[in-house]
């Protein structure tokens, strides 16, 4: 046998790393073709055998001409790339992609049990325990794909294959089916519309995982009843039933299961139960296998631990290649070669029950996608647990309950320093606002978003030399992120650059004073003054001028002084008292605050990472904060935001967004649930990301973020966009 040489990369190779192509009537690459298993939208599905290992695979053949005629080539590339990321026990695996001049060959896992639809037709309704077991597997696979930002949109029993060896189901065609063009459901779906959500058959624009939740509800109903909740020989009557959402559940279905089905088959997609809520439903939790108990228990795509028995078999199959060379090829990251494919084929062909493999070293936790956080309340990826009250600092959630004070600030030990941070505490030997005294008063952390004003009479100082015997661990970190985070609130701009907010601080220690100071034109002649003033004449050392525009992002100008720290009498024996001395200034996405108004005059918001504020009126004219004389090379990288609030339903908002984008001259693509990536058709160097968030009940935020281009072009474009939008 000749020595092993890696096959040349095909035309898809740069993206997929597929092997070389040998095509005859029976051979494609390293596979020998066999009988036809079925015919799909783009071509046939063939049974094949991997020549080296003898493992059976299914090869989906996609005809290039059909793909081109349907204008689906770019979507095919993107969805194939998504599918190659999937390594889940209940999703059909895609091992590699081979390309010829006429066809694309997707080498996939072969499952021998056939379609679940045929099983139900043959055996009738399933027992509730069996239905629950299969439903748990299906939801786990759907949840995994949603975490990878792929929505199926055509789930049905025909796309669920039975694996008789492992006694489980596997989702097929996941990722390819969501290439359907909106409004063309009946033309592109070769199956029945009985499983489609109301928003799909109505031709409304949709983008989220809620359509899969509906389909899963219909499938669960079919498991239990061997019939469909919505069925009619007349397609118009069928659509009418689906839109109305009226169905009956037989008495033999348990009340808990019936409750879950009803919550999944809610016509309004916003009110429909989410995957996360399904996982927590009492009926779903019964007899839930350990390996399905967490959405983050997935098989790793990379080979982290090599199975010795599989390795020994490969040494024999690929002789005379030595063992070390095989190990080297298997451990190559971000690459697919024949040895890696062979290893996965052998592992999968010998794998027993997945329930026995939960402790396998190949089981890892995936990277969680922020926009699909399981903690979200609805399919739209943004929630808030508090009202829009800018005057109440307690309305901002505290996400840090330990003793590590991650600061949004900088402690300065220099003289005459000017700072534009949210808050400054200036004291020698005090780092990161964390003060440790040697009199059992430990870890008294000053809230970062505060301002200390010390005038001539040393206000807010407790002259007891810190002789407190309280063992308090007071952490007042408000990790609030603005645009793209978990808290949203509105701010009213003051054109005099004075922002007043009476905040109620948190006090856990004794002798606590919570002050909100905003003084002007003060002459301070003392040391260690921390001023939040305009036009101050300071004649002292260690003066820190915290000029203008502070504490805007957190809407909190209060001082939370735990045990009232005396700035001139601190007995500190440690110059580095914080466990985490890093600056934590970056909100998600970064950017400066943009205060603007919607068509109703309501103030909107943006994100800030350094306290600077850009005030915009309805014409989006820049008022302040931009230093036009500074060297752009010396400025930190910023991402700019604009936004608009609406109370329209999400699908209507998305429809209005599409209309406005087309009117202004954008082209776009869907990159996630309720998320669009846009660029100008006329070639203007500007790229945007649009994201729709739910910020309250029946209240939605359209966030517009610049990811490329000049800031003033961004302002002009957004001005046109927001004028065009009718929200």
Swiss-Prot record:
Residues 382-590 are annotated as: Disordered. The modification Phosphothreonine is found at residue 188. Keywords: ATP-binding, Kinase, Nucleotide-binding, Phosphoprotein, Serine/threonine-protein kinase, Transferase. Pfam families: AdenylateSensor, Pkinase. GO terms for molecular function: AMP-activated protein kinase activity; ATP binding; protein serine kinase activity; protein serine/threonine kinase activity. The gene is snfA. One of its GO terms (cellular component) is endocytic vesicle. It is an enzyme of class 2 (transferase). Belongs to the protein kinase superfamily. CAMK Ser/Thr protein kinase family. SNF1 subfamily. The keyword ATP-binding applies. CDD domains: AMPKA_C, STKc_AMPK_alpha. It catalyses: L-seryl-[protein] + ATP = O-phospho-L-seryl-[protein] + ADP + H(+); L-threonyl-[protein] + ATP = O-phospho-L-threonyl-[protein] + ADP + H(+). This is 5'-AMP-activated serine/threonine-protein kinase catalytic subunit alpha.
